[in-house]
Amino acid sequence: MGNEVRVRYAPSPTGHLHIGNARTALFNYLFARSQGGKFIIRIEDTDRKRNIEGGEQSQLNYLKWLGIDWDESVDVGGEYGPYRQSERNDIYKTYYEELLEKGLAYKCYCTEEELEKEREEQAARGEMPRYSGKCRNLTKEEQEKLEAEGRQPSIRFKVPQGEVIRFDDIVKGEISFETDGIGDFVIVKKDGTPTYNFAVAVDDYLMKMTHVLRGEDHISNTPKQIMIYNALGWDIPAFGHMTLIVNESRKKLSKRDESIIQFIEQYEELGYLPEALFNFITLLGWSPVGEEELFTKEQFIEIFDVNRLSKSPAVFDTHKLKWVNNQYVKKLDLDQVIELTVPHLQKAGKVSEELSGSEQEWVRKLISLYQEQLSYGAEIVELTELFFKDDIQYNREARTVLEEEQVPEVLRVFAEKLEQLDSFTADEIKASIKAVQKETGHKGKKLFMPIRVATTGQTHGPELPQSIELLGKDTVLKRLHNIIQ
């Protein structure tokens, strides 16, 4: 193999881009770019029953959205194509026929029912299920007889017995498997389709992959692929198996786990930023030197070291993701935040589909008020709820504030000051609050908290005078009088 690093991300077009797969793509991409190598995308579509229409394009679109680009694939071509496994059947045929000729693979005529019975008998004896090798040494006559009965053969790889397969995993160190624990495995199904392990081994060799970085759920596939490499006399790439992503309860991420949003498409729909997701996902199972946590793509490429992939499972912390995204939202200019949030307010029916001059200016001020605390685009609907409803529900903490003895006086004087205002602006409202302080002698929390709670229903929030301006004079006075009465 040459010195140039060549790595791949090989999705199946079975659905949308999952965060675990996005992470695999990101680590391979960063490794290739950090080494001045090539990043390839290969589509593994041999399991036709699971493929969905548009699945392939969806994967590519969301990789692009994340900021990942590639050197070779179905869309950009390359010298080692085709890059879709379903278009490589003639290539696979060459190599499984070679294995058959060398006696390193054989035709298996067992039916699914026979194999199931075999597995049940092994389980009853407390043995690990593996193929017995029943068809391993059939004579040509026996094979012809079975074919005359109408049996379609699959092709099995002849696993060498009594050997140990060892490889030095980039992430986990040395891993070994005894071949006696691995039964002869199918490399070509009865319908002539190559199985995953065979197609992957052939493709990785012919596409000149130097490293195979993937999830640790593939570890048990690795000895099978190494045996295929050995049987065909090929150099073996370096393997690295990344730890799984777990939820905050340290349980393996399951697609049924609804506590975590798991598809990149959903994050785009919620108004997360691709740069923030790129940053967050890269730190799931990889750590830089030092304490810094926010990096641009270019910085990641510069500092990425494949030897710093973690040996421990990566915990998906939703609060951390929101924090990371918020850091990126804060850096946007206001027009970008408006672009990120307004569609969510429109979808929720809070503002017009076509914003007019005065409404546009009001929305602009509203979003400016919440930019600092906004975690993701769609959150704007929840954060600004108090501006779009007539009545406020006060929670226990808010009611406790309103029960303090100075509250009636503070709110009465504040309402009087607001009623006298000709210009209902944040500056005038700020001056009114100061006037209340002067007249009542109350200051600090004793002054601000009752005003905030009475007008917004919340004990925390953005700048108070600006919030009151955006609520409007009528709404604010109505809320104040409701409490005073």
UniProtKB/Swiss-Prot annotation:
It comes from the Bacteria. PROSITE patterns: AA_TRNA_LIGASE_I. It is found in: Cytoplasm. A motif ('KMSKS' region) lies at residues 252-256. Keywords: Aminoacyl-tRNA synthetase, ATP-binding, Cytoplasm, Ligase, Nucleotide-binding, Protein biosynthesis. It holds the Pfam family Anticodon_2. A motif ('HIGH' region) lies at residues 11-21. Its EC number is 6.1.1.17. It catalyses: tRNA(Glu) + L-glutamate + ATP = L-glutamyl-tRNA(Glu) + AMP + diphosphate. ATP binds at residue 255. GO terms for biological process: glutamyl-tRNA aminoacylation. GO terms for cellular component: cytosol. Its main location: cytoplasm. SUPFAM superfamilies: An anticodon-binding domain of class I aminoacyl-tRNA synthetases, Nucleotidylyl transferase. GO terms for molecular function: ATP binding; glutamate-tRNA ligase activity; tRNA binding; zinc ion binding. Catalyzes the attachment of glutamate to tRNA(Glu) in a two-step reaction: glutamate is first activated by ATP to form Glu-AMP and then transferred to the acceptor end of tRNA(Glu). Monomer. Belongs to the class-I aminoacyl-tRNA synthetase family. Glutamate--tRNA ligase type 1 subfamily. This is Glutamate--tRNA ligase.
